[in-house]
């Protein structure tokens, strides 16, 4: 649908000097780390990760180790957004499962330490891929990368949320209806101009939600660039801000937007040459691991997923407007609300 939704590794990977509006004094953080992390040593360097438009994320280098600090952004925020406390809770709960997540060291809800609530976790060494075409990889490596990320989301949806203490992490049932309502409210709260396709989707979606219902832990934003790879295996899943209890197929379909949003992913012959599975092949991989039939209502979940990411993009534009965006690249991501909403409505017109 749009080449603008494609991201570039060099632009978003690695760290940079902390943006002026996101700087904080390290003294109180040092005291907090001393109280919560044994043997860390003194803070030597604080850097900001280039990626991550939502919650500002920092690399904290000390004498003996490196850590990642993730905090709420300063300023006016949307209701229930930037929930670092929920991120901390789910990452901590999943640490002993087959889902690869970093070890957490603590949650701090005292604004006086760095200015907003934050949590600290281990720094996971590896590679984050922002370009879904994986231009620096061989066909065999690409196939392995896609196979392994499929395995991880299947593992996540197979975790018994009750056994890991997340029975209170969200409501059970009616996930999609609640999500449509939530993202509609978030979209309208951050609306910067009238978009006809979004208005039509807001009216159409609640009337066409499938009756099937099941509940699992869902990530909410399971993308290639929210994973850390080492030797082409996933060693860390990041950015759990949107996670909750929800519908696994909705979560997986959102993950599959790559095949609908990037032009090169429409060319099956090219994907085959590159070692990348096409949409149906990737969908079948998930079905084989989970036993779930994804053929029914797949297009509805695609429409819902496109609507959701369009609303996320609008939220980014809202933060740009309000001056609270965490990245200088925020606006170029936010403007994708236009092609994404048009793409979603075109599927409605073609299939319903």
Language-model-detected regions and their locations in the chain:
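All-alpha amphipathic helical-bundle segments outside canonical DNA-binding/catalytic cores
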Residues: 170-171, 293-305
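Active-site activation/catalytic loop segments of kinase-like enzymes and analogous catalytic loops
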Residues: 250-290, 304-323
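Activation of the activation-loop gatekeeper triad in protein kinase-fold domains
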Residues: 238-243
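Catalytic-loop of the protein kinase fold
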Residues: 217-219, 224
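Juxta-kinase regulatory segment immediately upstream of eukaryotic protein kinase catalytic domains
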Residues: 2-39
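Helical subdomain adjoining the active site within ATP-dependent kinase catalytic cores
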Residues: 294, 311-352
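ATP-binding pocket architecture of kinase catalytic cores
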Residues: 43-217, 233
């Amino acid at each position: 649908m749009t080449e603008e939704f494609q991201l570039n590794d060099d632009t978003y990977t690695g760290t940079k000097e902390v943006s002026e509006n996101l700087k904080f004094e390290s003294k109180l953080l040092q005291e907090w780390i001393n109280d919560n992390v044994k043997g860390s040593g003194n803070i030597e360097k604080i850097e900001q990760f280039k990626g991550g438009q939502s919650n500002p994320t920092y690399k904290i280098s000390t004498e003996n180790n490196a850590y990642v600090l993730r905090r709420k952004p300063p300023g006016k925020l949307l209701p229930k957004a930037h929930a670092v406390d929920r991120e901390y809770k789910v990452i901590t709960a999943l640490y002993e499962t087959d889902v690869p997540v970093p070890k957490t060291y603590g949650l701090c809800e005292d604004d006086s330490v760095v200015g907003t609530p934050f949590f600290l976790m281990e720094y996971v060494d590896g590679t984050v891929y922002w370009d879904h075409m994986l231009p620096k990889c061989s066909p065999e490596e690409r196939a392995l990368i896609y196979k392994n990320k499929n395995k991880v989301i299947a593992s996540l949806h197979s975790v018994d949320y009750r056994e890991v203490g997340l029975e209170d992490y969200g409501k059970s049932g009616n996930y999609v209806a609640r999500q449509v309502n939530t993202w509609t409210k978030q979209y309208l709260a951050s609306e910067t101009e009238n978009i006809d396709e979004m208005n039509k989707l807001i009216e159409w979606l609640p009337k066409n939600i499938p009756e099937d219902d099941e509940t699992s832990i869902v990530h909410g934003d399971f993308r290639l660039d929210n994973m850390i790879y080492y030797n082409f295996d996933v060693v860390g899943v990041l950015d759990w801000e949107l996670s909750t209890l929800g519908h696994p197929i909705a979560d997986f379909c959102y993950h599959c937007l790559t095949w609908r949003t990037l032009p090169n992913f429409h060319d099956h012959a090219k994907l085959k040459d590159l070692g990348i599975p096409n949409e149906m092949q990737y969908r079948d991989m998930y079905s084989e691991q989970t036993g779930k039939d994804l053929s029914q209502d797949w297009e509805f979940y695609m429409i819902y997923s496109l609507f959701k990411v369009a609303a996320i993009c609008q939220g980014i534009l809202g933060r740009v407007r309000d001056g609270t965006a965490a990245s200088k690249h925020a606006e170029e991501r936010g403007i994708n609300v236009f092609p994404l909403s048009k793409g979603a409505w075109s599927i409605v017109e073609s299939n319903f």
